[in-house]
Amino acid sequence: MKSILLTLMVFSGLIVFADDKNEASQSLNPILIDVRTYAEWNDGHIETAIHIPLEKISNTIEGVIKDKDQVIYLYCRSGNRSGQAEIALKSIGYVNAKNIGGIKEVSTNLLLKILKD
């Protein structure tokens, strides 16, 4: 049941009604961010993710993602740090930041591979 809810939550963020095609296309392409440490990232990360460690996310995000309406999916090892990242991003205006859990859960539910460097 938990995986069904996560899948529904993730894909519900993909449905957008917008007049501006650019705005719609941005929202249709969520950005996946891994907020774990560099060592954890190097041990394996989701294939489409970008890496911004939790301790740097508040100071780095605006240089990476300008549009504060962009859908952002956050993950870590268990979902704890990605939950903290969601709170931090929402506090600076990223209204569509979503904690989607831990790396194994995300990989399984989104059918994405874990790559090792």
What do the PLM-derived regions correspond to, one by one?
Residues 2-4, 16-30, 38-70, 80-117:
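Rhodanese-like catalytic fold shared by cysteine-dependent sulfurtransferases
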Residues 34:
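Phosphate-rich cofactor/ligand-interacting catalytic cores and adjacent structured alpha/beta frameworks
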Residues 75:
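Short, surface-exposed ligand- or partner-binding patches at beta-edge/loop junctions that are enriched
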Residues 6-10:
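Hydrophobic helical h-region of N-terminal Sec-dependent signal peptides
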